[in-house]
Amino acid sequence: MKKHRLQAKPLNLRSRLSALALGLAAAGMLAAAGAMAAEVKTIEPGKLTIGLNGDMPMTQIKDGQLSGTDGELMAYVAKKLGLEPNPKQMDWAAEIESTKQGKLDIMHGAMGWLESRTKIMILSEPIYYFGTLLAQKQDTNYHSFADMKGRKVGTVNGFTLVPELKTVDGIGEVKLYDTSDGVMQDLLAGRIDMAILDPPLMQYAISQHPEWKLKQIPVDPEPAKYPVMSTKYNVIFGINKNEPELAEAVNAAIKDIWKECLNVKTMAKYGLSDKAWFIPPEKNPRIEVDRDATYKAPTADHCF
């Protein structure tokens, strides 16, 4: 029996040139990623050591990978920089301290911009924005700072608003917790009257557990007395102060996130599709602190 050998058809010149172009493009992308990784200094070469507290829907480690609204964007940034994500889970206060001490390259998880934080780490461009909301039982209607008078308010130790919350006129007690779970448990048990948690987390919890009969209401702003809690936060990544090249590369990746609407798409996956998440504060507190007077915060108008 005669054996038949399969023979590839010869490529014409155009096909050869196209294949060569594709090969060069792929090689170029790999080289660019490699060059970026080589230029960026990190604690462990070739890896991005990332702090997170595991609060969903913002971030968690699932099957060894980062997931969640912020986590998936962080994974995108690492890939863009040609670095392998090296996530480390810890409580919020430990995240801040570890970044400050240079034990983490970067931290994330609905992290709000705060002027005091600019003194201990480099704060990235925002990935989205949110304001202060009061989480409470459905049968209450707390919506103002006056409503905190004589009442117990719970939040997480290390959150942006803690120093200001303690100054609210007549507030009954500010109860601080190491984790959001602790706050939530006491709110459900009636041991605190209201809670201030990351709005994405609360919105996700409310949608997943309607039987808890919780809601969250925006606080009536009083910017003259309580500027931090009366404005929208820039949600950012916190970067090791000793890694300015990393910060520059991270900001370049975040610029692409806004351009490609990746933050809008990722938030929508977790039920956070309202345009308000992508509208910056009218008066940006970063101006003349870590951004100059010409700074324009990114928006996602082109994504809607």
Regions inferred by a protein language model and the residue ranges of each:
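Short helix-initiation/N-cap motifs at beta->coil->alpha
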Residues: 71, 87-97, 140, 175-189
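A ligand-binding cleft/hinge motif common to bilobed small-molecule-binding domains
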Residues: 94-97, 109-119, 164-167, 193-231, ...
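Extended ligand-binding regions for polar small-molecule ligands
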Residues: 71-80, 146-147, 151-152, 159, ...
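Ligand-binding clefts/hinges and TM-proximal coupling segments of bilobed small-molecule sensing domains
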Residues: 163-175, 216-218, 248-296, 302-303
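A conserved helix-loop-strand patch within extracytoplasmic ligand-binding domains
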Residues: 83, 91, 111-113, 124-171
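Extracytoplasmic small-molecule ligand-binding "clamshell" domains
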Residues: 38-111
